Amino acid sequence: MPARTWILTGSPENLAATRAHGFGVIGLKERRRRQALEIETGDRVIFYVTRVMAFAASARITGPLYEDRTPIWPGKAGNPDPYPWRFEAEPEWVLDEPAWIPAQTLVDALEHIRKWPREHWKLAFQGQLRQIGDADARLLCDRLAASTPVTAA
C-alpha cells in the first residue's frame, strides 16, 4: 500500500515541543488510538498550526506505533493529555514561523477543504488528525519544499 499523508493539527506550543525534539517523535492524543493504528512506517505527517492557521512542517514516520506517556507536549491548560500513541519520525521540511504557509491561501486549491462551505473552511482542520488525498499531499509538499530555505553544505 502506498504511503498516506495525514494532517496533524496542533497548537504553536505543541509544534515548538515537537521541534525541540527534532521532529523525531510524533504523538497522538489518548482518544486517537484507532487512527494511530492506521498510520504506517513511510506515511507523511503535515503539521497545521492552530490560531496561526498555517502549515509549518512535514515529517515521515520511520517506526511502528508505540505507547509512551512521558510528557513532551504541553496540551491544553487544565486538560492534560500525554499524547501516548507515538511514532518515531524524521523531518522532511521545517519552516521558520515567518515562512509558515497560511491555509487561507490554499482554500480554493485543497480538495479536503471543499467538503465545507467556503466561509467555514476552518472546520476542515478541527480535530487532531485527518488523512488527505494525493493531490492535496502533492500541493502541500510542493509549497513546503518551495518555502524551505536551502542551506549550503
Map each language-model feature to its residues.
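Short, glycine/serine-rich, charged loops/turns that create anion-binding
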Residues: 12, 52, 66
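Contiguous surface segments at macromolecular interaction interfaces
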Residues: 1-12, 21, 27-34, 69-153
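Short beta-strand-centered aromatic/proline hotspots
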Residues: 55-64
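Short, charged beta-turn/beta-strand-edge "cap" motif at the junction between a beta-strand
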Residues: 48-54
